[in-house]
Amino acid sequence: MRDRSLDAFRGLTVLLMLLVNNLPPGAPAWMGHGPFGKSLYLADWVFPWFLLAMGAAIPFSRRGFLKRGLPPWLYEVRALRRALLLFLLGLGLTSLQAGRPVFALDVLQLLALAYLVGAWLYDLPPLRRLGMSLILLLGYGAALLLVPVPGVGAGVYREDANLALHLNRTYLAPLGLRGLFSAVPTGGFVLLSTFLGEALMEGRRGWLLALAALGLGSLLLWAFQAVPPGLLSPLLPLGANPLLGYTLPVALKATILKGPLQALLAALVARWGPVGGWVWTGSYMLGWWFVFYWLYRWGWVFRL
């Protein structure tokens, strides 16, 4: 099962990712990542929106699976398989960017762990599921505030001193698991986002209004429900292929496109200054949109 508004939201998220990952020189600071712990800039929305879309898709995926007459336990196995493949794909992409084999946690690996939490705990009754998601989210926040960090103390949350950083440096980084602690709130957020997926699936506007409090992403998803289908069409090619929309540009930019893209950017900036940089960014985004438009037209969707 697929939801048009959810596909459109995923497409918007992929477009946003292409934008913030390819900003030209001199781009406004608010389009990048914000100062640590102070404010949210444009780039800071990308990862949470991926998590939101992932969680909202779980109810659709599970219902479509069970409609085929397959046993529920097989869905859990399938979720484990998808998480494992996504994790391995992330390792491959991280290694490709590093130019050598690397075992480390990056974006796709964290998405895989968060998806596994959301998919496996989705079977819980609604109140227990809500309670578990809040335990993960609030428990993470409480740990940051209350657990003392050696040499720093409790309640300190600076970029150079906080509990997550201490755990990463002291215990997780030597094992290649730097960032594993972040799987706690990301898993909780994906689980919480399953309620949004259920509201979309059942058309419950009251729930959608309540869930809009989750953030701007939820509000956009709700707004997309009221948008005429034709207006959402430009976002669907990327939204139907979000995993490929993330991995393919990153992989090619790190390998065969790296040199040509840098040369083209330098030439455009030298000729037209800041305008040339934006021409490069816009052309890069438009080029990928056309790639995924034709994949969409051909019905080619990459799934794990």
Task: Report each predicted region and the residues it spans.
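Alpha-helical transmembrane segments and their immediate juxtamembrane cytosolic regions
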Residues: 1-304
